[in-house]
């Protein structure tokens, strides 16, 4: 698969989707995108900047949701054009697909909406690359059907169906907790789509703080290393210069100053994993 100007797949180095959870301000977006571009360029990591114009599934109705679609898309367009990086954002409603697809390089669908057929089809029919997050309630093999819905819609819209990615972000484990079953990364290859691992939402504690979600960011490196050792096409990690002050998902965000060291270790591990191939394919 080729997207955003680079090749994506297990035969290539992992690419990175990263940025603050939500667009808090124009200044934060530009500062974070610029810093991430510097880091990833030095390490040779293909990079897509991510931030949301609206967080439609916050725990509390009083929580900060974002700057809205108009201002948010303007900031993302300016980041893309002025910083010089591809941009990704999530859409939450079918009506948002067309205006968002006109601006961003890749769409992302929230995990909660992975079974909403009309929504998934609309995203895929835009013919933009679409990163479909697996629901916390879904078995990894069920993503085969989700991906097929999207692929069919893309083909019907005149594409070849190769614009779909699938993303693991953990599975519900009782109340207010998630676990990551690393087998799912291999199982989700059965979709025929590149597999992305979301290392920050996987350490989220949904609703764990009552009016907001908690998180255990200290386990982001642990799960990211495990995913890279399994073999993934891409990594998703939210980051913030000061997670304690982040307006959304701060408890599971990677401090921006720690991204270089984390990514350096992951690049080395990715090289080893992909150089040696995937012996599990011979076990079937």
Curated annotation (Swiss-Prot):
Name a single GO biological process. keto-3-deoxy-D-manno-octulosonic acid biosynthetic process
Q: Which GO molecular-function terms appear in the entry?
A: 3-deoxy-8-phosphooctulonate synthase activity
Catalytic function, reaction form: D-arabinose 5-phosphate + phosphoenolpyruvate + H2O = 3-deoxy-alpha-D-manno-2-octulosonate-8-phosphate + phosphate
Provide GO CC annotations from the record: cytoplasm
Name the InterPro entries for this protein.
Aldolase_TIM, DAHP1/KDSA, KDO8P_synthase
Query: Where, per UniProt, does this protein localize?
Result: Cytoplasm
Q: Which domain of life is it from?
A: Bacteria
Question: Which keywords does UniProt give here?
Answer: Cytoplasm, Lipopolysaccharide biosynthesis, Transferase
Copy the pathway line from the protein's UniProt record. Carbohydrate biosynthesis; 3-deoxy-D-manno-octulosonate biosynthesis; 3-deoxy-D-manno-octulosonate from D-ribulose 5-phosphate: step 2/3; Bacterial outer membrane biogenesis; lipopolysaccharide biosynthesis
**Assigned EC number:** 2.5.1.55
Q: What is its main location?
A: cytoplasm
Task: Check the record and name the PANTHER family matching this protein.
Answer: PHOSPHO-2-DEHYDRO-3-DEOXYHEPTONATE ALDOLASE
What family does the entry list?
Belongs to the KdsA family.
Name of the molecule in the record: 2-dehydro-3-deoxyphosphooctonate aldolase
Q: Which gene encodes it?
A: kdsA
């Amino acid at each position: 698969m080729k997207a955003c100007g680079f090749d994506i797949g297990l035969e290539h180095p992992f690419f990175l989707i990263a940025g603050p959870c939500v667009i808090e301000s124009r200044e934060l977006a530009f500062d974070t995108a610029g810093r991430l571009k510097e880091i990833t360029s030095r390490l040779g990591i293909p990079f897509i900047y991510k931030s949301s114009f609206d967080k439609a599934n916050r725990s509390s109705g009083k929580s900060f949701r974002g700057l809205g679609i108009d201002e948010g898309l303007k900031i993302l367009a300016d980041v893309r054009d002025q910083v010089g990086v591809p941009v990704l954002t999530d859409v939450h409603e079918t009506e948002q697909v067309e205006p968002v697809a006109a601006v961003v390089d890749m769409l992302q669908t929230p995990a909660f909406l992975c079974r909403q057929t009309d929504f998934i089809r609309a995203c895929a029919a835009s013919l933009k690359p679409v990163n479909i997050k697996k629901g916390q309630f879904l078995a990894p093999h069920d993503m085969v059907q989700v991906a097929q819905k999207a692929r069919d819609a893309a083909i019907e819209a005149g594409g070849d169906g190769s614009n779909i990615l699938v993303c693991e972000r953990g599975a519900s484990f009782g109340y207010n907790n998630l676990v990551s079953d690393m087998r799912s990364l291999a199982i989700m290859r059965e979709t025929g789509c590149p597999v992305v691992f979301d290392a920050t939402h996987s350490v989220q504690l949904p609703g764990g703080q009552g009016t907001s979600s908690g998180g255990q960011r200290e386990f982001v490196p642990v799960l990211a290393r495990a995913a890279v050792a399994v073999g993934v096409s891409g990594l998703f990690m939210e980051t913030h210069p000061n997670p304690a002050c982040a307006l959304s998902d701060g408890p599971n965000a990677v401090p921006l100053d720690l991204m270089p060291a984390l990514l350096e270790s992951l690049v080395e591990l990715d090289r080893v994993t992909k150089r040696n191939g995937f012996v599990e394919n011979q076990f079937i």
